[in-house]
């Protein structure tokens, strides 16, 4: 019995250590740092270039079969729903980065097989920060999920919230990165 308990504790510790090593970073902004104007949305009164930032990750846990990236602004004044800025899923398990500028509507620069969902701007692809003027700094949460399945079966036209639900249901670990922007 003691051997079984020890084995379980050891396995849980190894899993926790593995998940703790899972990291998401960007050479384009520091964790908790300001997001530059070139990544800001172009439209809705914002005048950025709407270029998606570069993202790199490492330390995905054993058993990862694909990834999904969700970018959300919980500070958006939407009655509590926040705002979805980017949704990418079916990223192959072999991928370790998303290059700057890959978030175009056609997703041509994304790792092969990746699919972009519709954002709250109404279309697929990166929709950069664009908070209301004078609303303070918003927190843009980039969450990379390591998934237990190779491919998520998501219907065409699914909302970002539905995609987020399916992603969370299949997630085995997350790596997070926070960026700030206000105007």
Identify the residue ranges that each predicted region occupies:
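Positively charged n-region of N-terminal signal peptides that target proteins for export
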Residues: 1-5
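N-terminal signal peptide c-region/cleavage motif recognized by signal peptidases
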Residues: 11-16
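N-terminus-centered regions that define maturation/targeting leaders and the start
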Residues: 18-183
């Amino acid at each position: 019995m003691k051997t079984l308990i020890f084995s379980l504790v050891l396995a849980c510790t190894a899993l926790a250590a593995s998940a703790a090593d899972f990291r998401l970073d960007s050479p384009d902004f520091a964790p908790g740092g300001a997001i530059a104007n070139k990544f800001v949305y172009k439209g809705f009164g914002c005048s950025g270039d709407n270029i998606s930032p570069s993202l790199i990750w490492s330390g995905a846990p054993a058993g990862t079969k694909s990834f999904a990236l969700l970018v959300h602004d919980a500070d958006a004044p939407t009655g509590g729903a926040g705002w979805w800025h980017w949704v990418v899923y079916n990223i192959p398990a072999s991928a370790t980065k998303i290059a700057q500028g890959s978030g175009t509507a056609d997703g041509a620069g994304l790792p092969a097989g990746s699919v972009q969902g519709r954002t709250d701007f109404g279309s697929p692809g990166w929709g950069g920060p664009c908070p209301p003027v004078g609303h303070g700094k918003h927190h843009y949460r980039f969450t990379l999920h390591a998934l237990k399945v190779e491919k998520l079966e998501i219907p065409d036209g699914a909302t970002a919230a539905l995609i987020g639900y399916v992603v969370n249901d299949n997630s085995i670990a997350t790596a997070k990165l926070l960026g700030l922007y206000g105007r």
